[in-house]
């Protein structure tokens, strides 16, 4: 019988204060069956992104937090608690490093070897940093991306447009909801029937289809009628996409959210059933990887052909282009990345994914904070539309949570307002405030967030390290540095931060420092690279940059 983990609710503490209770509840929330993709194996999302290295390490993390003093800091090395040291009350209670490798050895083969020896763990982005909130965590970012695409190409709406993608895991599961929120009709291909069923249960997906003809019939009818509809098709994109090309059916928009970043534990080869693929993964991993990469090449070739025939095609940051390129698809990078196409201008303004979680477990706490963010920022139309749609259509997974994109100044203002609500007793318990690592100044990822930087600094990884150091110095509740999230081992370095709004005056200082410096560094990073929007923002906001002219 598999173990079931669920975060405590209510106001009873299991640790010495809320600054320690917060990571205690959030690591458990990451493994809640409502939240995690494969909780029995400690896998939260993203192929093999884990919350802890093994169950023994998980239990020791909880035990360490239960006994942690208010002026101590727990160190976690790739999902394993390795030390507790006396620091001070304003220091982080937990510091995490996941999957870090010396650059010469930063590749999947070395990582898998070390993982098999029990020495490391893949933390993805928010899996190993204990701030994953289910598919909602990416829905809003996906909504922002498709909204920017719709604004650029289709007068702000996806109405009457056919969007094709694949992957309905923890990340990809956000796609159908985001697309239908913008009135589009979409077909999402997924090999795992259970993942499709899960998205139906959470109301992120409208319909499941077993047959391509059936799926196309529904999607094309919805497109013609200008009706929002999402269809999940049981199938493999490496088979389905080439078949669409053969039939001459070219969608308006094409992207991909399969776990292509991980050719062993993520992407599933075509030409076999899912059960056969899982068996091959265990019996002959080298053959599995070979077949997976071949399938990715076929997948990308079909996307390129659709692009040539007029589809708007973009890469959604899963490194599928690189995998295909390595298999001989030399024009794979003709497909542009979503960040320079649709998101970078937002990063230049210090905007990014801001999330908060009700430690009480009471949805009313989130609804009250929804109202507060609308009161604070009434002139932001995308934010207001998102909050309204999220309240109507996003089902909570695990502890109730919300996400929205906020910029420099907005984050600190809202964070302080939340802390004031806790202090006044308007909320039943403290609120955890965090973000995805996919943010303005916290990641170096040349095939995703930092692709095609203006000054050529795509691979410069000082920025996420500076981000983690700054957030530690600013007094965050916990800080993490990870390797390989989103695009796989060897391709990214990134940092996460969480602060617990416990209602105290001391936490006002934490919040103001963390939620100002964190997005502020993103503006600095982009201004340093020569982006005019970031330079203008830095000057307007009074951000000190010694070498800014």
UniProtKB/Swiss-Prot annotation:
Cofactor note: Binds 1 NAD(+) per subunit.
Localisation: Cytoplasm
Cofactor(s) required, per the database record: NAD(+)
Keyword presence, tRNA processing: no
One Gene Ontology MF term: urocanate hydratase activity
Family: Belongs to the urocanase family.
Protein name listed in UniProt: Urocanate hydratase
Organism from which the protein derives: Caldanaerobacter subterraneus subsp. tengcongensis (strain DSM 15242 / JCM 11007 / NBRC 100824 / MB4)
């Amino acid at each position: 019988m598999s173990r079931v983990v669920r975060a405590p609710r209510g106001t009873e503490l299991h640790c010495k204060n809320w600054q320690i209770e917060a990571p205690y509840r959030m690591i458990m929330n990451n493994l809640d069956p409502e939240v995690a993709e494969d909780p029995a194996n400690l896998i939260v999302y993203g192929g093999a992104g884990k919350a802890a290295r093994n169950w023994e390490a998980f239990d020791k993390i909880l035990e360490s937090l239960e006994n942690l003093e208010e002026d101590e800091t727990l160190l976690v090395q790739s999902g394993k608690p390795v030390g507790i040291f006396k620091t001070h009350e304003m220091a982080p209670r937990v510091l995490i490093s996941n999957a870090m490798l010396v650059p010469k050895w930063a590749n999947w083969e070395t990582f898998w070897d070390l993982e098999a020896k029990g020495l490391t763990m893949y933390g993805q982005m928010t899996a190993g940093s204990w701030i994953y909130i289910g598919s909602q965590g990416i829905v809003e970012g996906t909504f922002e991306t498709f909204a920017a695409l719709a604004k650029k190409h289709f007068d702000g709406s996806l109405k009457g447009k056919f969007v094709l993608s694949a992957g309905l895991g923890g990340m990809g599961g956000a796609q159908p909801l985001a697309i239908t929120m913008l009135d589009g009709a979409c077909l999402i291909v997924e090999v795992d029937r259970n993942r499709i069923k899960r998205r139906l249960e959470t109301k992120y997906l409208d319909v499941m289809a077993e047959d391509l003809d059936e799926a196309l019939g529904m999607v094309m009818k919805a497109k013609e009628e200008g009706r929002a509809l999402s269809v999940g098709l049981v199938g493999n994109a490496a088979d389905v996409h080439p078949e669409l090309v053969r039939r001459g059916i070219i969608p308006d928009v094409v992207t991909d959210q399969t776990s292509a970043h991980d050719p062993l534990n993520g992407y599933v080869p075509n030409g076999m059933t899912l059960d056969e693929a899982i068996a091959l993964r265990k019996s002959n991993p080298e053959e599995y990887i070979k077949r997976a990469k071949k399938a990715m090449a076929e997948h990308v070739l079909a996307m390129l052909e659709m692009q040539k025939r007029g589809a708007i095609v973009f890469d959604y940051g899963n490194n599928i282009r690189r995998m295909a390129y390595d298999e001989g698809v030399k024009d794979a990078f003709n497909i542009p990345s979503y960040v320079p196409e649709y998101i970078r201008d937002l990063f230049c303004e210090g905007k990014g994914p801001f999330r908060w979680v009700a430690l009480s477990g009471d949805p009313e706490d989130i609804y009250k904070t929804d109202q507060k963010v609308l009161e604070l920022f009434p002139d932001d139309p995308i934010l207001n539309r998102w909050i309204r749609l999220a309240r109507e259509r996003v089902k909570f997974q695990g502890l109730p949570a919300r996400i929205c994109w906020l910029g420099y100044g907005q984050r600190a203002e809202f964070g302080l307002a939340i802390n004031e609500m806790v202090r006044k007793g308007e909320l039943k318990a403290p609120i955890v405030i965090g973000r995805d690592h996919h943010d303005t100044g916290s990641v170096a990822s040349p095939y995703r967030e930092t692709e095609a930087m203006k000054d050529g600094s795509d691979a410069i990884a000082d920025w996420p390290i500076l981000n983690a150091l700054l957030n530690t110095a600013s007094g965050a509740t916990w800080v993490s540095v990870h390797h390989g999230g989103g695009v796989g081992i060897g391709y990214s370095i990134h940092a996460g931060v969480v602060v617990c709004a416990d209602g105290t005056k001391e936490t006002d200082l934490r919040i103001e420092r963390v939620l100002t410096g964190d997005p502020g560094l993103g503006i600095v990073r982009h201004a340093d690279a020569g982006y005019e929007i970031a330079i203008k923002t830095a000057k307007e906001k009074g951000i000190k940059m010694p070498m800014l002219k």
